[in-house]
C-alpha cells in the first residue's frame, strides 16, 4: 500500500482493525459503535461517526474499501489529505443524518398507528429501535459523487455486468436505483437512504466548493 495516499490508507487500516475487533467481541462492538435510532436504549452520541468504521461482513468491508482505494485515492491526490477527510466525514455524517431522518418519518407513522392499537406498528417500532446500521457506504457513495463531478466524462467499467459508462451516468443510475429501492422497500437490510444521503451531501459540498472557487485548492 506504499502508493496509497495517507488518509485513504489510514481509513482502510482503521476499518480492517475494527472488523477484527468486531469478530472478537461482536455484541460489545455493535451495541457501542453501530448506529442506533436516537430513542433506542443502545444509542450513543458518537455512533453517527463510529458506525462508518464498522461493516456487516467481509464482502461489505472489501467492496467499500476497494471503492475507497480506487476513487478516494484520486480525490485525495487532488485535494490533499485534510480536505479529503473533510469531504469523507461530511458525506458519511450526512448519510447518517438522511438515514435517521427517514427513520424518524417512518417512526411518526408507526407511533400514530400504535396509538390506535396496531400490533404490527408496535412491532415495527421495536424492530427499528433495536436494529443497528453499520458501514462506510454513505461516505463511499459521497466519494463516487465527488469523482463523478470532478471527472464526469471518465469511462468506468463494471465487472458485473460488464458495462462501460461515463462516471456521471453511473452515479445517476446508482442514485435512481437507491431511490427506487428505498421508496419501494425492496432490497431489505440495506440502508438505501444512507447511500442517497452520501450522494446528496457529496453533491452539495462539491457545489459549495465550486461556488467559492476552492474546489481544486489543497489542504494537506
Locations of regions flagged by a protein language model:
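A detector for small-residue-rich transmembrane helices and their helix-helix packing motifs
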Residues: 1-220
Amino acid at each position: 500500500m506504499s502508493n496509497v495516499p495517507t488518509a485513504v490508507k489510514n481509513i482502510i487500516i482503521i476499518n480492517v482493525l475494527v472488523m477484527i475487533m468486531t469478530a472478537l467481541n461482536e455484541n460489545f462492538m455493535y451495541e457501542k459503535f453501530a448506529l442506533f435510532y436516537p430513542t433506542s436504549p443502545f444509542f450513543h452520541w458518537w455512533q453517527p461517526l463510529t458506525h462508518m468504521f464498522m461493516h456487516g461482513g467481509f464482502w461489505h468491508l472489501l467492496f467499500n474499501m476497494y471503492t475507497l482505494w480506487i476513487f478516494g485515492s484520486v480525490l485525495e491526490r487532488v485535494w490533499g489529505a485534510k480536505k479529503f477527510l473533510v469531504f469523507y466525514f461530511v458525506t458519511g455524517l450526512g448519510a447518517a443524518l438522511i438515514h435517521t431522518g427517514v427513520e424518524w418519518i417512518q417512526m411518526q407513522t408507526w407511533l400514530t398507528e400504535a396509538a390506535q392499537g396496531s400490533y404490527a406498528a408496535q412491532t415495527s417500532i421495536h424492530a427499528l429501535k433495536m436494529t443497528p446500521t453499520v458501514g462506510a457506504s454513505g461516505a463511499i457513495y459521497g466519494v463516487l459523487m465527488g469523482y463523478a463531478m470532478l471527472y464526469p466524462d471518465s469511462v468506468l467499467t463494471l465487472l458485473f455486468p460488464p458495462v462501460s459508462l461515463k462516471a456521471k451516468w453511473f452515479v445517476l443510475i446508482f442514485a435512481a436505483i437507491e431511490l427506487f429501492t428505498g421508496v419501494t422497500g425492496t432490497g431489505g437490510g440495506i440502508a438505501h437512504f444512507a447511500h442517497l444521503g452520501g450522494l446528496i451531501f457529496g453533491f452539495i459540498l462539491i457545489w459549495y466548493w465550486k461556488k467559492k472557487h476552492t474546489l481544486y485548492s489543497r489542504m494537506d
